[in-house]
Amino acid sequence: MPPVTPLLDTVSSPADTRGLSIAQLRQLADEVRAETIDAVSQTGGHLGAGLGVVELTVALHHVYETPKDILIWDVGHQAYPHKILTGRRDRIRTLRQGGGLSGFTKRAESDYDPFGAAHAATSISAALGFCAARDREGRDNKVVAVIGDGSMSAGMAYEAMNNAYETTKQLTVILNDNDMSIAPPVGGMSAYMARLVSGGGYQSLRNLGKAVSRAFPRPLQEAARKAEEYARGMVTGGTFFEELGFYYVGPIDGHDMDALVHVLQNARKIDDKPVLVHVVTQKGKGYAPAEKAADKYHGVVKFDVVTGAQAKSQAAAPSYTKVFAQELVKHAERDERVVAITAAMPSGTGLDLFGQRFPERTFDVGIAEQHAVTFAAGLAADGMKPFAAIYSTFLQRGYDQVVHDVAIQSLPVRFAIDRAGLVGADGPTHAGSFDVGFMGQLPGMVVMGPADEAELARAIATAVAIDDRPSAFRYPRGEGVGVEIPALADPLEIGRGRIVREGTAVAILSFGTRLGESLKAADMLAARGLSATVADARFAKPLDVDLLLRLAREHEALITVEEGAVGGFGGFVLHALAEHGALDRGLKIRTLTLPDIFQDQDKPEAMYAQAGLDAEGIVRAALAALGIDNASVKGRRA
């Protein structure tokens, strides 16, 4: 049964909230929270973050004239309540589904999403851009950026704040302090904000205010409580933010609608310099299972609303992430120089398991990929064996450091690139599409693409053994294929692939976990009387040139298959073949890559089918290369 939401049913846009009383806003927040819980229970997605900002979301849309006033959410995974209030409630149960709403803010989706997001710490920079454009054109609309305490561990947030005072006189930054990003926030800024909230001045003021107000007649007690809320900023300070040129207001209770509305109304009037409003919230607020286990309810699959039990299917094989963590532990037990680095994603990268075994050799640097990479470079320069486990999409944030601090110096940093390829429901912002290209372009870099769990174990062993240059290995989200993993895998011979199946007419050269689909394609071609060789490249750099030349020499057509963008493995293969004159005799070649678009969210298998990277797509490419009618093969390449 859907929740009963009589007040929310009357709200079709934020304008409908602006005539509501504080009591009605509280009721609306309760109904938005119930609607969010019910919707996410059916779709899965990010739950805890959105529940923590329900009151803040309602208050912001009540006080500010969105979409005229610009409201930018950092990261965006907390924006489900925002979507419910901004005309998308009728589609909220399509979140993260094919053809449905994005799980993040998205410009193409609504005028209420002026700036898309999914990566951390972009909001203040984007907001400053809106401020500068507004100021130049003489408009008077307001600009607000909402950023979490976890994102405040990213340097980009401070780059923007450092630039704010000299850029504009009107910007409101809402610091949503829930003391919980995905993992607990780390570093000096997290400790600083904790001191603000727990400081003696703040606590003394609260206690004094409560004691004094109790002596007042009842009608004055509420007024005294409001005065106490407004005065907090004057007592607690917020010196760091003030030194950056901001007014500092807070900390205030992010679930107190009355306080939120009044503070935001005052903040909206400030137009002589930027203001930071420090709001303290609880992740998962209002849903007991999420309050008790915020880390377990950051991102969820479908779940039972009553019990909170998530409908997780029994895995047929361990995830690639878990295999990585287990294998790294094995090597760390044998080599005390092995250390691990994560950028605020210990559970997502599996390094929570490594950290349980080797806490003193595990470094969580916060949402700071640039720092993570150069920190790893420093470790490597002094003889350690660092493994930087970073999602492919987030490694993009530290690419200059990969080039300048690691590759140019030939430092043996090992990059464990998780979430390679398509990631399904998280869509284009989280797809691992580009790492093969941008890593493979670097002189001296070793780039591996394991085909299964056992090959991943061998790639890790290879990275441990490489001590004179950087290396990287990529692996996807989700379960492996169920192959047996050796007790301790042997390293691979660098730059050597393998023949998995011998054939004659066409060669299929796979890089990464499309090997299974390549073998299926070979079976389908065999059913049509076409013999296919299937090879596993193992390395995108250095390429196995001997294998390439053999495949080119012995087959009429060559098909390369990869889970990456144009300009990656297939491009490297073409370059190598051209350099060796292997294209001169008329070899028919097709390079199968992800399409040259940003694919919207869907089930991964549907996305790979759209890309032509499933068995049927590989068969179509092979038949086309050979000039054979493929009308009997279902589907088409997108």
From Swiss-Prot:
UniProt keyword Magnesium, yes or no: yes
Residues reported in the UniProt entry to bind thiamine diphosphate: 77, 118-120, 150-151, 178, 287, 369
Pathway assignment: Metabolic intermediate biosynthesis; 1-deoxy-D-xylulose 5-phosphate biosynthesis; 1-deoxy-D-xylulose 5-phosphate from D-glyceraldehyde 3-phosphate and pyruvate: step 1/1
Binding site residues for Mg(2+): 149, 178
Enzyme class: transferase
Cofactor binding annotation: Binds 1 Mg(2+) ion per subunit.
InterPro entries tied to this protein: Dxylulose-5-P_synthase (IPR005477), THDP-binding (IPR029061), Transketo_C/PFOR_II (IPR009014), Transketolase-like_Pyr-bd (IPR005475), Transketolase_BS (IPR020826), Transketolase_C (IPR033248), Transketolase_CS (IPR049557)
Catalytic activity reported: D-glyceraldehyde 3-phosphate + pyruvate + H(+) = 1-deoxy-D-xylulose 5-phosphate + CO2
Entry keywords, A to Z: Isoprene biosynthesis, Magnesium, Metal-binding, Thiamine biosynthesis, Thiamine pyrophosphate, Transferase
NCBIfam families: dxs (TIGR00204), PRK05444.2-2 (NF003933)
Stated family: Belongs to the transketolase family. DXPS subfamily.
Subunit composition and interactions: Homodimer.
Function: Catalyzes the acyloin condensation reaction between C atoms 2 and 3 of pyruvate and glyceraldehyde 3-phosphate to yield 1-deoxy-D-xylulose-5-phosphate (DXP).
Protein name: 1-deoxy-D-xylulose-5-phosphate synthase
Annotated source species: Phenylobacterium zucineum (strain HLK1)
The encoding gene: dxs
